[in-house]
């Protein structure tokens, strides 16, 4: 049994894909230096993993990343880590990384959820409720708070067929995935911009993100 959960009672494998920290969240540049952005991204990942780890339906959590710091943090929190083999210059690196992880994770669980790694305000119960709702559909997704992106993609007994990228919410909808309509404000609040971070902080972020943001403000 690998992954962040050790009891083996769940039937869902969670995947989080993380790019190199130095290339992440460039739209936070108006409020954070490059080094500070790396710290913020890592802290958000840690808070996301910590909240997700308490979801009883999860058998495992897998982080796929080319970044050594992200891999080390995920390992310390008990997640399975896969080295992202996606080549530099790949035209679709995020979806290809997810597909690589899906090939591995699907060997041990029948159901897979892909979650963004920048959800510092996500509550455990929000993710648990979304997974419960997703069980009614082969493929489903949770849109972000703006309705244009995707916070989570769920596949129950089906291939993921990830469509992340610009306007991913519409792309997932067109691909046949059902949009889940629960409120789940923390689950929907991924952080790409200063406005996103302000929204997450208004909901209440996890301790790692709170510490790092306070240190760099």
UniProtKB/Swiss-Prot annotation:
Annotated TM spans:
none
Where on the tree of life does the source sit, at the highest rank?
Answer: Bacteria
GO terms for MF: GTP binding; phospholactate guanylyltransferase activity
Keywords of this protein's UniProt record, alphabetized? GTP-binding, Nucleotide-binding, Nucleotidyltransferase, Transferase
InterPro entries noted in UniProt: CofC, Nucleotide-diphossugar_trans
| One GO biological process term | F420-0 metabolic process
Entry EC number(s): 2.7.7.105
Catalysed transformations (reactions): phosphoenolpyruvate + GTP + H(+) = enolpyruvoyl-2-diphospho-5'-guanosine + diphosphate
Annotated residues that bind phosphoenolpyruvate are located at 150, 165, 168
Instruction: State which pathway it belongs to.
Output: Cofactor biosynthesis; coenzyme F420 biosynthesis
Entries under PANTHER family matching the protein: 2-PHOSPHO-L-LACTATE GUANYLYLTRANSFERASE (PTHR40392:SF1)
Which protein family is named in the record?
A: Belongs to the CofC family.
What role does it play? Guanylyltransferase that catalyzes the activation of phosphoenolpyruvate (PEP) as enolpyruvoyl-2-diphospho-5'-guanosine, via the condensation of PEP with GTP. It is involved in the biosynthesis of coenzyme F420, a hydride carrier cofactor.
Q: What's the protein here called?
A: Phosphoenolpyruvate guanylyltransferase
């Amino acid at each position: 049994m690998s992954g962040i959960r050790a009891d083996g009672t769940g039937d869902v494998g969670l995947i989080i894909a993380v790019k190199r920290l130095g290339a992440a969240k460039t739209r936070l540049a108006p409020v954070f230096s490059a080094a500070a952005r790396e710290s913020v991204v890592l802290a958000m990942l840690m808070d996301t993993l910590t909240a997700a780890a308490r979801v009883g339906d999860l058998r495992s959590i897998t982080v796929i990343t080319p970044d050594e710091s992200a891999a080390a943090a995920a390992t310390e929190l008990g997640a399975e880590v896969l080295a992202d083999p996606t080549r530099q210059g790949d035209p679709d690196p995020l979806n290809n990384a997810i597909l690589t992880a899906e090939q591995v994770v699907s060997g041990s669980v029948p159901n897979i959820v892909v979650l963004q790694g920048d959800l510092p305000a996500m509550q455990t119960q929000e993710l648990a409720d979304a997974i419960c709702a997703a069980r009614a559909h082969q493929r489903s997704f949770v849109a972000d708070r703006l309705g244009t992106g995707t916070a989570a993609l769920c596949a129950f007994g089906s291939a993921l067929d990830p469509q992340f990228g610009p306007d991913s919410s519409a792309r997932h909808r067109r691909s046949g995935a059902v949009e889940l309509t629960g409120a789940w404000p923390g689950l929907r609040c991924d952080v790409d911009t200063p406005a996103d971070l302000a929204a997450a902080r208004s909901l209440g972020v996890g301790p790692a993100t709170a510490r790092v943001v306070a240190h760099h403000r």
